[in-house]
């Protein structure tokens, strides 16, 4: 279920504050955040945001087609190692 339109998109205040200061001083360093739940706003375009995946901060470069999605969608939390091979097929 999507968020109600009358509520508007959610973005943590501390993240918005960091983005505004980074844009004001034209800083290209990644903005470190733990807020995976924040929606990507049009102000974020062109910035690199380091999103925490539970273990480390994954750098995410924000482009135009990411607007409206959540930051957590681009920092995967699980690593897929592959399914176990079938022993009968190897023989």
UniProtKB/Swiss-Prot annotation:
Keyword Ribosomal protein: yes
UniProt GO molecular function: rRNA binding; structural constituent of ribosome
PROSITE patterns cross-referenced by the UniProt entry: RIBOSOMAL_S19
Domain of life: Bacteria
GO biological process, one term: translation
Record keywords, A-Z: Ribonucleoprotein, Ribosomal protein, RNA-binding, rRNA-binding
GO CC annotations, alphabetized: cytoplasm; small ribosomal subunit
PANTHER family linked to this entry: RIBOSOMAL PROTEIN S19P FAMILY MEMBER (PTHR11880), SMALL RIBOSOMAL SUBUNIT PROTEIN US19M (PTHR11880:SF8)
Family the UniProt entry places it in: Belongs to the universal ribosomal protein uS19 family.
Function: Protein S19 forms a complex with S13 that binds strongly to the 16S ribosomal RNA.
Entries under NCBIfam families matching the protein: rpsS_bact (TIGR01050)
Protein's UniProt name: Small ribosomal subunit protein uS19
Organism per entry: Herminiimonas arsenicoxydans
